[in-house]
Amino acid sequence: PTHLHVIATVQDLDLEKRATRFDEPVGIAFANNQKAYVALSSENKIAVIDVASRLVTKHLSIPAQDPRALTVRHGKLYVIPFESNNKTQLSGGYKIDGDLVTFDAHQHSIAHNNVLSLGHVLDIIKHPRVPDKDLFVFDTETDRLIETVDTLGTLLYGLTVDSKGTVFIAQTDARNDVNGRSGTKKHGLAELENRAFLNQITRVEFQKNAAKKPHFIDLEPLPPVHPKPGQAFATPFAVELSPDDKTLVATAAGSD
């Protein structure tokens, strides 16, 4: 009688504030028959759920924006944030150096109304000190964070893990820094070459829980070479491996 029927729901309510703590659940994965994980995208957390009681027992903090896709393989939970960043930011600061800092951010945004202030030289730059955390690996037995991997892409969509623990991530890497020198070098759309993102699959191998250097599989030629008409891809989204690990299958979201 319960076939294809909802048999239960999971909620986590703050009774004093009359608000949910189970906000924007997106991805789900099971550690085993007793424990499940749910990505709470807008909360930047993973809810840990006891399957038998259907109650949230705790949360895992994800210090990145919008964790969505997650999967479990061989006792490890793998989580990627959707908007992971790519170290880019406006070139503001205090001491202007003409490279990473091209305008006084305090004078522009705090001391004066930034809508009224004129004459500031604004670039989009890649700053080495900006965090870019892209992959989080947890031990499903203890829920302890094992490893964090940086710089795997900008918008991270789907992930899968093979039998050896190699991670594959469907992602698009933003090129907003390619024409970012709009202030100092007067960059415009021409420098972007109509390629705002690179469509890629990122491959990450591990050795004793430590990530090796990632490998980027380009789905299209890299600029200045461009795909021929009819050969460009839409956004790489879902990704999955065949049971024998020999074939990687991905979808292109937005394809006609």
Spell out what each predicted region is:
Residues 2-3, 50-54, 139-143, 206-209:
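Short loop/turn segments that connect beta-strands within beta-propeller blades
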Residues 15-32, 63-73, 132, 153-162, ...:
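Beta-rich, blade/repeat-based domains predominating
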Residues 80-129, 169-199:
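Short, conserved, GDST-rich strand-edge loop motifs in beta-rich repeat architectures
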Residues 5-20, 83, 101-116, 130, ...:
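Surface-exposed loop and turn segments in beta-propeller and other repeat-based domains
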Residues 43-45, 84-85, 133, 174, ...:
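Loop/turn residues immediately N-terminal
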Residues 35-38, 77-79, 166-168, 247-250:
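Conserved beta-propeller blade signature
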Residues 33-34, 74, 164-165, 245, ...:
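Conserved loop/turn motif of beta-propeller repeat scaffolds
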